[in-house]
Amino acid sequence: MIPLSTKYVQRPELEYPFGLRWSPEEGEPFEVADGVHWLRMPLPIALDHINLWLLRDGDGWTVVDSGFGSDECREVWEHVFTTFLTPSQVKRVIVTHLHPDHIGLASWLALRCECPVLISKGEFEMYNNITIRDEAAFQLESQQFFTEMGYDTDVIAKFVHFMSNDKPVESRVQASMCEVIRDGGVM
């Protein structure tokens, strides 16, 4: 491979402060810095977990991302609510992007904790476009498009399912639950 630059910068080896491939147990927040807790949440796919973050926020907490919309993830949250913090201590839920493991339980958490969901304007608009579309028409158009592109039927079926709206999102995140963050906005 030809380097893009004649200058080569020696980079230090990665450091794993908690050990290589170590992660906390599901539902057991682990403090990684003052007021910053790492929360491991299960996923029912090959990548078997997502990392969520609990941030100390004055006398309460901010939750960053919510987990998959599944009974298993709700049970993990209920464990956190009985062992680490109470729902009333959650001041807000920040959704970083619209993947179902990040937004999946956002509406459930907002209702359970009586707090707003913060999401960027672009992500909220994209989420709305996905959740209000005609799903049957979208799947048919996607199937036709990928067939014309020459993809195998198995690949097409997997991709159309991946892009479909039957994701494990607990319930639709409503605009009334949200504080939409505009470009350059401050939380």
Predicted regions and their residues:
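N-terminal presequences and immediately downstream first alpha-helices
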Residues: M1-R21
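Intrinsically disordered, low-complexity segments enriched in polar/charged residues with Gly/Pro
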Residues: E15-F18, V32, L39-P42, K167, ...
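Short solvent-exposed loop/turn micro-motifs enriched in small/polar/acidic residues
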Residues: W22-S23, A46-D48, C178-I181
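Conserved beta-strand hairpin/beta-sheet module of binuclear metal-dependent hydrolase folds
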Residues: E26-F84, S88
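Core dinuclear metal-dependent hydrolase active-site scaffold
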Residues: E31-V32, L54, V180-M187
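Active-site HxH/HxHxD metal-binding segment of metal-dependent hydrolases
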Residues: E72, E78-V186
